[in-house]
Structures are given as C-alpha cells and as structure tokens.
Amino acid sequence: MKRTILIALAAATTMITCQPAAPVAPLAVYDGPKRPEWAASDNIYEVNVRQYTEEGTLKAFQSHLPRLAEMGVDILWFMPIQPIGLENRKGELGSYYSISDYTAVNPNFGTLEDFQSIVHQAHELGMKVILDWVANHTSFDHVWVAEHPEFYTKDVDGNFPIVAVDNDGNPTDWTDVADLNYDAPGMREAMIADMDWWVKNTDIDGFRCDVAGFVPTDFWNTAITTLRATNGPLFVLAEWEDPALIEAGFNAVYGWEFHHIMNEIARGHKNVSAIAEYAAKGDTLWPSETMKMYFNTNHDENSWNGTVEERMGDLGNAMYVLAAMMQRSFPLIYSGQEAGLNHRFPFFTKDTVGLDWSTPHGQADFFSQMLALKHKHQALFNGELGYDMSLDTDTATNSIMIVRGEEGEEDQAAAIFEFGEVSSPFDVPENMDLVIDVTGAQVWVSKLD
C-alpha cells in the first residue's frame, strides 16, 4: 500500500505503547531449504478478485485458471480476500487492506470453500498460490479491537485504536486502518497463528507481506521460521526493498527503485546510465539468493499513478522485457495486462469499465512468450540460479545491451533496448535466435536442443 504522511497530524499525536516485550523466539527450529525448489524460474501474477470479472467473485475468477496455466503463470498472488471493515471505510466497498477478521473470507468474494477449490485446482494445473498478508494494521472494527485491545497502539491519552503510523510514529492518511503494537505480549503469537491457519486450512504456498518494512524485522524472522518449521519451505515476498528482509527469511522483495527508474527513462527524465548504476549497486548490496519482483505495473501503480501507457507510453512492453532481463528478476504480471488493460481500476469501488476476456488479446501472446523464455533458459532463472549479467550502454543513442551468461556458455540471453531516436551501435548477437521484437526492445536467446 502507498503511504502519504500527514505532517500536520504528527505534531498533534504522540505515540505510547505497552512496555516493550522481548522479541518472541521462533516457536520451532527450521533448517530446511529457504526457497522452494519450484521457485527457480517462476513468475508471479497478481489477482485483484474484485475487478477481475463482472461478478467480482472467487468462483468467477476460477474459470480463468486453465487459461492462466496455459499462458505460463506460476504463482498466483491474491490481494487480500478477508472481510473489509465498516468503521471509517473508504468508498463504497473499502480497501482490501482494511481487514476486520484475519481468518475469514469477504462474503462479497465468496466462501472459504471457494478459495480452497481455487487452490486445489491451481495445484492440479501446476501453479502455486500465495495470499496477501496485512500484518501492520487492521480495520478499526477488527475482532481483536474488542477481544485484545492491548494489541493496538495508544495515543498519549490512552485512546485506541489510532490511525496506522509510519516508522517515525507519524500518522498516515490510511484513516481506515488501526495501528498494531508489536511490543504487546501475545500479539506476535496471535498473528503467526492466523497466518498458519491459512496454510493449514487452504494449503496455500506462502504470503506476500504488505508494507513489510513497517513491521519489526525480528517478527518476520520469527514468523517465517515458525511457519516453515511446520509447513515446509513456504515462499514469502516482501512489499519493501531492504536486504535485512532477505536475511530475515524472505525469498523476494519489491523492486520499487528500479520501477521508478523505468518510469523516468520512459518519460525522458533519465537515460540508460541509471540502469547501469542501479545494477552496479545491487551487486554489492544484496545477498546472492535475493529475488527482486520487477514490474511495469501493479495494483498501486495502476490505481494511483496511472496505466502503463500513461506512465510509459509505447515502451510498456520494452520495460517488461527490461524487468525480466535484470539480474535476480522475478517478473510480475497484474490482473488484466494480458487482456490489454488500459484504464485505472478504482481502489474502493467496483470497476464499471471491465476487462474484455471474450477474445484473446495480442498482449497474451507477448506474455506467454516472455514466460516461456524464463522457463526454458537458465540464463534468466531467479536469484543466484540465473546467469551473471553484463551491460553495455551508449548514452549518445540512449540504448543499452544486456547479456545474461558468459560468452561460450551453452545458454545465453541478450537484449538490446533503444530508448532514443536513433538506432543503437550494438551488434546483433551471433548464433542466437531473435525471439522478442517490440517497440524499444529485442531479445535473442541461444539455440537449445
């Protein structure tokens, strides 16, 4: 979720909490693999249930599972499907991230059995399912407010719950959600128990953790260790960009910084040197096993900052190719991109424009080709399993060539990106096949048997 700090409120509110509790030790020891074997070359697809179909239900979405599997989707990430709070609700339907009960399903979306059926069919089709988890805050009418008021942050006068705050204690503009107090005895264990409930009752394969950097890192270490000890190597994605979260057990983090670089290049505000600078910094900053979720859109970007076309013009596909070619890349597709999504989904109401699923769109072919390349070519695998990346930039033409894999290796992938008005000076790779040709980008790969 996006956070906009209300500076004016910061001076008016002083935060106090219970006496700090000692960090909860992992409830079990886990010495198994951190990353599931199936995550080696996986991609991720974000599911916005409310806006995906005219019905806006889990059952209606389920009919799309065979198509998504055929397209090559590996991981389905469901935005929160729990009930949405009524108190201080924004808009008619409210924010998905204002949850009133962690262990229930939003009746507007369907039932627990509906979701269980989706997970079962997704597994049969070879896909995995992860659920969005909102650990930083709840709705103001969450069941914990009455049952465990001590779980919430209080103001100087002892009032609770209060609006969610940032890491400096400043109130956000998320006026529909209440801040949780991670120093409260018993609160961490309750959160982990509710996460485990979903794994045990629905057989999901992991979590995408909302605004993970606003939650104590030692909690994540405890939670991930405990959940893996009882459920095996779950896949966990952080909506944040901090190496400490990889050390705490996350498999992947957001590539927010690179996303903003792509936006700026598309707008002509930066050139390709920004890509090289970003890549060089990452070589020293991130653990080798890091997976970065790169994207040209997601639910936040689409609703609040504009469509791919609004932000990137005709370079949207080129930017997706760029995201997929980067070292550590773990590329995202957002709901409807393969159907040519070109309008902003409203965040707190039902979309009235809709997605046209009646006929295949050319974007579906593009994404199918890109996902197939990642599956077939180890040069493009995730984390340290993928091959090393080399860059060659030409600022005069605002072009860059990216190669994954060393010369002489059996498997290589190469891409040339041209973001200027004239052609790049780079030579077309020899003994490789041209497999992707879109505005601003071309991709070649080794001829494999």
Spans of features found by a protein language model:
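Substrate-binding/active-site clefts of carbohydrate-active enzymes
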Residues: V29-Y45, R50-K59, S63-D74, P80-T202, ...
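Hydrophobic faces of well-ordered beta-strands that scaffold small-molecule active sites
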Residues: N43-Y45, L76-F78, V129-L131, F207, ...
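Conserved, mostly hydrophobic/aromatic
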Residues: V47, L68, F78, Y102, ...
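Short, solvent-exposed turn/loop segments enriched in Gly/Ser/Thr/Pro and often Arg
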Residues: W77-K90, D132-D141, D210-P216, E239-A244, ...
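Active-site clefts of carbohydrate-active enzymes
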Residues: P287-R311
